[in-house]
Amino acid sequence: MSQASTEIVRISGHAGTVPGAGLNREFQVCKLVDTTTCIGCKACEVACLEWNGYTFSETTFDNTYQTMPETAWNYWNLIKFNEHERADGTMMLLMRKDQCMHCADPGCLAACPADAAIVQYANGIVDFQEANCIGCGYCMTGCPFNIPKFDPPSRKVFKCTLCNDRVSVGLEPACIKACPTGCLHFGTKSEMKELAETRATQLRDHSGFQDAGVYDPAGVGGTHVIYVLHDAKNPELYGGLPKDPRIPWSVRLWKAPLKWLGNMAIVGGIVGMALHYMRFGPKKVEPIPPDVSPHGTPSGSQNDERRGQGRPS
């Protein structure tokens, strides 16, 4: 595919948009995951580990096909399994590829106070710059998908980058190259939405899945990873996919009105001190009279005179 723009449009620790240098490409990229054709082979998990330089580790998540309960700081791609009993009593194995959703309105970026620790490129990818991460973990509370994960030894937070290093030079993400069934697709956002809607229509019209649809939640401005689901009305069945994800109200409150009020309070305090100084001047200390001690008692010769008056003649 063509190269997508790596121009920075937003960074953490700054309000509004931030222009940056990048490739002169305007389109936004998108990954489409068709859960109806996923076989749970985990080839995408292996490809993600290998491309990003992480080693395999033994897991203890037994009695399930799933590798581990959730993604980890060094395990960004995870196939989630759920055995769902249908209305007719038959069992259906639902599988979903779990990774960063690369939201158009990312909660992690909104919550992060560190300068340029999180960046959003013009192609839609949300990337972490670990060198600028301060390890506060606020991004973890801002994400409605529970994706950013903290690494205690390094005190940094990590997540899927949508293989931005590959995408920026015209390559597909590693997980998509490894998929044997073609359930993963990559292209522009408009192309992937059209392909997803076509597939959902096929499922409704020809496969008996009347509730099939596309998962591209509006609560976070849409995402650059979208899903085709058999049952789009109940996304929670697919490994806990939130039905209506939104940035937590606490993050919105802290980053908008409370931050503004705090700044206004600081400015008001500075202005108040300046006005007080201009009206009353610097604080003046009244000098102590030379014949009075700090405790208000007579001093010097007066004390001697009084002591002399009290002596018998």
Walk through the language-model features, giving the residues of each.
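Non-ligating segments of multi-cofactor redox enzymes
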Residues: 1-313
